């Protein structure tokens, strides 16, 4: 089968008027598509839900400000990635699909698999990993599970969407090789192995072209190369030019923006800017999806098994937690020892991030409430600190006295809500200082401190010496408390392994000098050296390496056999406890002609072994094991050479090494090492303009803000506005943003508006504002107040009049037989 699938509902499309076709490609409401009753084409419902369904009971809004129905809050993607367990991912996907189907949700907007370029990205908790192979494999497992229940999964955000600051008005400047190898490979796996039936385009531009309008991305790569046969959905408010989006391969603009975009599509067809064949193809793809989703078998039971899903969330959390430190085997806990439990997080757990993925859970456990279910000698519990920074000296003193009298202290701490949220990037990697001050004081009176961390992304850990053991739960969902206690008491043997590197300090990170960008462009100068690819190659010492995690037992590796199509390796549990090991296969090419990381993850397997048990595992090679993208020939190629196959327990803990010869197919190597010395060493923190230009193969775009503001500039850029009123509005927005940050709770509405381009006013107001009116607003912002007001007022009445005309045409079409 070629890339272009046969339109299953062609006869329906042929019966549609052009007004119906154009209207169908934009949403009806915030979450629903339009129906065409006369042709029996129903509306379908889309919902957020990467780690739990967020279907709102009343009026819908993009950011979840209105209450949503109860759903299971599973651990976030960043947490589950640490399990390295594809079977678990599929199990969670099935549960998500069941819950979506029970709520009549047709398309689930997830999973998120953007690459963790920097630890500071505020939405990292929603993404799997810094590694594209692990991200893709875990995403594919979720997708298979979700879609097994008659619900489409919609992986997001395609592509290169790595910062929240001005995410809707940012141009990612990235070379084609890095785009392919780092930022697209995960999506490729999700499509080819997960068979995703929908995909969400990202807000940003990629090399000057909006992702939703990028034909190279949406047609040449997604559909032709990967064989994608589903629908492309915009991120909410992410449609810039709907006509260009339709031509490029985008099917559905969300949310509803009235009929403004539909009128643009019709005008483009009539003036020849858009081929009607392209319009028909997009409509056909969408109608195919709608009919498949509404005519297939779906769960009719409105009540999913809440208890079973809660227990699955517990299992998932336990398998995903990472034991980072365990001096003198202080864990599992000795039940005879007296224990003090301290920390705000023990009473009010932080189990998910903020933003569009926030779930209204069926129930939430906290450690303080369920401790009595475990055979532990609890001396006492107290908060000791307030996560909002308020100080209660009496409680602090009580915490220190309690610690002094206990044999062991369990200290629960981590990042607060304002630290990790959609629409907001972190400014540093530190845990709030009041928590660390208390930890340090406790460690002075009790050396047996067990730190229980809650954070959705990497953090700096200069305080790690204050803890004898550290158990990192990430954001572990509604059943995280019992999962944590299962590990602390030895009921479960920890088997989580880090899906991202923990650097010693933020200044060590590869994109330190380039992230986040405060200009129009974000330059990906670090190239392929993201995460461990950078630290490992440039020999930067880290706190905890990619793939790291401890167990209550020990594993040995032996008998590595390298075959033409994969490897075999034996793993033995040499300890006295049953446990699971994550066997990781890395591949490198010493003395490569084409610069590359020292090693890259190309396969993994999680194996459960009883004490003393040994098992031979097989990890296959695939089409991604040896390839690189040759920018000179525009294709995947293999460089001839002797490749190192490295098998170990982390990127820094290689147990067995072997070699394999590969005959390549390169038809000319793309780089001149003399012109790219730092890319050949991996030391990429200070890449010059000349070297970056050589990598790109063209001049570096000018990303400076200058001149008048335009419709695609972010509203926060009104700092530069010529209008005093616009600058006043900017100051008010900034003040409200800072106030919410000071209170410790992100104001999602303010954050969205702050980062939104002016065109978003038209895209996010349900048809009340047209693009003509937006141009008037921008005129006013640029100091042409009267001209702008005339456009806004005139545009308002024209928009109302034109919307009524359009609705009349649709009603007339509906009266036809």
Language model segments and positions:
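Glycoside hydrolase catalytic-domain context in secreted enzymes
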Residues: 1-624, 642-647, 651, 756, ...
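Terminal connector regions
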Residues: 623-670
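Long, low-hydrophobicity ectodomains and other hydrophilic envelope-associated domains
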Residues: 694-817
């Amino acid at each position: 089968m070629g890339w272009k699938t046969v339109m299953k509902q062609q006869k329906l499309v042929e019966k549609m008027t052009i007004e119906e076709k154009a209207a169908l490609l934009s949403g009806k409401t915030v979450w629903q598509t339009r129906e065409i009753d006369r042709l029996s084409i129903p509306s379908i419902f889309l919902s957020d839900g990467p780690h739990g369904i967020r279907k709102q009971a009343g009026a819908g809004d993009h950011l979840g400000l209105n209450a949503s129905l109860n759903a299971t809050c599973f651990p976030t993607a960043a947490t589950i990635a640490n399990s390295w367990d594809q079977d678990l991912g599929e199990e969670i996907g099935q549960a998500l699909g069941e819950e979506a189907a029970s709520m009549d949700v047709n398309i689930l907007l997830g999973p998120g698999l953007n690459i963790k370029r920097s630890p500071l990205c505020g939405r990292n908790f929603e993404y799997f990993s810094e590694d594209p192979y692990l991200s893709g494999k875990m995403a594919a497992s979720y997708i298979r599970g979700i879609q097994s229940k008659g619900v489409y999964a919609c992986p997001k955000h395609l592509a290169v969407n790595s910062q929240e600051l001005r995410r809707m008005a940012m141009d990612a400047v990235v070379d084609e090789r890095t785009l392919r190898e780092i930022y697209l490979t995960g999506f490729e796996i999700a499509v080819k192995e997960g068979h995703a039936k929908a995909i969400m385009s990202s807000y940003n531009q990629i090399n000057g072209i909006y992702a939703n309008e990028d034909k190279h991305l949406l047609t040449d790569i997604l559909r032709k190369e990967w064989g994608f046969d589903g629908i492309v959905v915009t991120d909410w408010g992410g449609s810039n030019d709907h006509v260009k989006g339709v031509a490029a391969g985008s099917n559905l603009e969300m949310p509803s923006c009235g009929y403004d975009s539909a009128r643009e599509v019709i005008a483009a067809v009539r003036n020849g800017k858009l081929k009607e064949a392209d319009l028909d193809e997009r409509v056909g793809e969408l109608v195919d999806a709608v009919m498949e989703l509404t005519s297939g078998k779906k769960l009719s039971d409105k009540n999913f098994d809440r208890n079973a899903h809660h227990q699955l969330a517990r299992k998932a959390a336990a398998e995903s937690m990472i034991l980072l430190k365990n001096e003198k085997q202080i864990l599992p806990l000795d039940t005879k020892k007296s224990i003090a439990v301290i920390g705000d997080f023990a009473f009010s757990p932080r189990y998910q991030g903020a933003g569009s993925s926030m779930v209204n859970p069926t129930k939430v456990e906290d450690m303080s409430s369920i401790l009595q279910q475990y055979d532990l000698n609890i001396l006492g519990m107290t908060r000791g600190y307030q996560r909002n920074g308020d100080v209660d000296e009496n409680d602090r003193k009580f915490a220190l006295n309690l610690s002094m009298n206990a044999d062991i202290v369990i200290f629960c701490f981590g990042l607060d809500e304002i630290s990790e949220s959609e629409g907001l990037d972190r400014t540093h990697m530190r845990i709030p200082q009041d928590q660390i001050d208390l930890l340090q004081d406790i460690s002075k009176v009790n050396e047996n401190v067990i730190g229980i961390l809650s954070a959705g992304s990497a953090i700096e850990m200069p305080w790690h010496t204050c803890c004898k053991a550290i158990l990192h739960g990430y954001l572990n969902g509604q059943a995280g408390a019992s999962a944590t206690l299962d590990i602390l008491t030895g009921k479960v043997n920890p088997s989580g392994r880090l899906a991202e590197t923990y650097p010693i300090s933020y200044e060590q990170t590869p994109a330190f000098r380039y992230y986040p960008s405060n200009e129009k462009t974000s330059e990906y100068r670090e190239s392929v050296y993201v995460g461990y690819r950078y630290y490992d190659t440039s020999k930067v010492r880290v706190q905890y390496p990619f793939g790291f995690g401890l167990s209550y037992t020990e594993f040995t590796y032996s008998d590595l056999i390298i075959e033409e199509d994969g490897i075999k390796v034996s793993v033995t549990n040499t300890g006295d406890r049953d446990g699971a090991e994550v066997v990781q296969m890395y591949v490198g090419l010493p003395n490569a002609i084409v610069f590359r990381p020292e090693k890259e993850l190309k396969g993994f397997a999680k194996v459960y072994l009883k004490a003393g048990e040994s098992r031979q595992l097989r990890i296959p090679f695939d089409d991604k094991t040896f390839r690189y993208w040759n920018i000179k020939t525009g294709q995947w190629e293999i460089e001839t050479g002797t490749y190192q196959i490295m098998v170990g327990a982390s990127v820094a803990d290689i147990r067995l090494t072997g070699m394999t010869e590969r005959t390549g197919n390169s038809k000319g190597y793309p780089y001149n090492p003399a012109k790219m010395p730092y890319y050949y060493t991996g030391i990429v923190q200070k890449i010059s303009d000349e070297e970056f230009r050589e990598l790109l193969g063209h001049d570096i775009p000018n990303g400076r803000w200058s001149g008048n503001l335009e419709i695609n500039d972010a509203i926060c850029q009104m700092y530069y506005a010529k209008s005093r009123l616009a600058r006043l509005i900017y100051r008010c927005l900034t003040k409200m943003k800072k106030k919410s940050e000071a209170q410790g709770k992100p104001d999602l509405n303010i954050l969205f508006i702050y980062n939104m381009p002016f065109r978003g006013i038209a895209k996010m107001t349900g048809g009340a504002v047209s693009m003509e009116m937006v141009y008037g607003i921008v005129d006013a912002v640029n100091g042409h107040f009267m001209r702008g007001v005339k456009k806004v007022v005139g545009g308002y009445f024209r928009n109302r009049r034109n919307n009524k005309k359009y609705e009349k045409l649709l009603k007339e079409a509906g009266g036809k037989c």
